[in-house]
Amino acid sequence: METKELILKKALDMFAKSGYDSVSIRDIAKAVNIKESSIYYHYKNKQDILDS
């Protein structure tokens, strides 16, 4: 699975479990074991992930 897909899958799981407002980009990066900058390479922001 590519990084972008991993970010999306993990973020959506986290949003469902904890709520969108409770999850940060930092939380997603930590869960996927990547740097925050890698998320911003693929997505503009958290809303962009949700809209994907």
Identify the residue ranges that each predicted region occupies.
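Append "Primarily bacterial transcriptional regulators
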Residues: 27-31, 39
